[in-house]
């Protein structure tokens, strides 16, 4: 019987992995389907050094540079998630929907996010259709309609892929798709960087960069795995007046929000670059470039990026972990934190602890994200510039999160086997 259950468990995991890989392959195939009617070679040559396109390419796996069917990628969905989550904290009716209506409320919030993503994708696709006008062979309103419809449908498909991966596959769908898009561009990135710097690069430069990135990877794994264990005592233990040898703990991660603050902050950072493409006022464009990293003075950009990561770390953590809910659950289980009174005192203790952990985790995320920019500014070393702290955080963070999800899935199935 146990052998049969184990084989079913392994087959279920294999099915999830195969399903995830299938959707990943489909998302990559759509990236290489070009929109007809565009002079893609001329377009690529004109935008190869555009920071806005470079950023969007990270999220679309190169689809934006070639104006593929999936050129918008997961960006509209991410932006929609930010908008809806901000609205949820600001609008009482949405906040009530999320906190008091359980799974039904969550489904309504998800549906609202989809609608906002659809509108956002439509707006972006119309903007792109006007942006590529100089490179279109026969530009007219029919082309605008066809291209906008194609890009919007492509973005909605990517959104559906990401949701299906999260629900029926392995890993977090949006993060995993961004991860695949980043690593798909690594070979080309490494080749171009080596070719552009092989005449100037020194052996010491390579050693320094490899050392820095190695330290960053170790640090990212440390921050992803860091946990503060809070001892919990049950009513039975409390009645005895002492803790048992087998102490229970409430684990709080140092970085509750994973790589999502980085993704959200990056999505916001693209707005100044996008607006700079649209405005004609030179002074306003100069001000916008101070926030998109293309200005020679990057201090304001780095401060803006740093602040966004801190904000989204607190914001996203507040969405996924509510100290008041944890306090209520402990009370229902007739348990309490050792040395802390149940109820309001427990909520305040958890909130204080969570704030400290989030601050430390956010500081580290922000530091890792801006380190490559600081090194480039101080040393003028730009080797592997495209693989910045943001990309590195996403690559390592998603790998760690996905492996942990697989382990959790296997453990949960083992518990099911024991119960049976």
Swiss-Prot record:
This is Protein translocase subunit SecY. It is found in: Plastid, Chloroplast thylakoid membrane. The gene is secY. Its main location: plastid. GO terms for cellular component: chloroplast thylakoid membrane. InterPro entries: SecY, SecY/SEC61-alpha, SecY_CS, SecY_dom_sf. The chain crosses the membrane at residues 17-37, 58-78, 117-137, 141-161, 170-190, 203-223, 259-279, 300-320, 357-377, 378-398. One of its GO terms (biological process) is intracellular protein transmembrane transport. Disulfide bonds: none annotated.
